[in-house]
């Protein structure tokens, strides 16, 4: 993830996007949702979203229209004028996802996008992510929820101690593990340890 964000230079190998060498400054529009969330918590929800929309090249009117529509979609329409620090952690996370997908980025990097959500809100957010995928966005995300992998992903890499323990299409990984489910594969690789799984 850090290489995709331009924070690290890869020691070897290549980063390709649509078959071309990938550079952060290469014109690919990017949306990033970090695991550690961070927005301007003393500002109102609508002001924060409009501000980030303008940073992403949207007009103020476009950013406001998108923000209000999105807040309605995630059941936060009544929070538009509330300061972010008055929202729950889950509500703030919904706002941050909205900021991440503003202006339809070509590449979405999501680090634990549904962490801490109940099943209802997890499904809601995964519906939104799936819509971005269907609209043509490339999505790279870290998750420990194998049902999300089964639903959304074409390829996966499971890392342990910095080494890839499984990589390929979902079908090829299952075949490698004798047809096991992704849940069973995760348990086999990580046992009782917390693992890191990156999917696209």
Language model feature labels by segment:
Residues 13-28:
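Conserved ABC transporter NBD signature motif
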Residues 50, 54, 61-79:
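Conserved ABC ATPase "signature" region
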Residues 5:
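Helix-to-loop junction immediately C-terminal to a conserved catalytic motif
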Residues 108-112:
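Catalytic Walker B motif of ABC-type/P-loop ATPase nucleotide-binding domains
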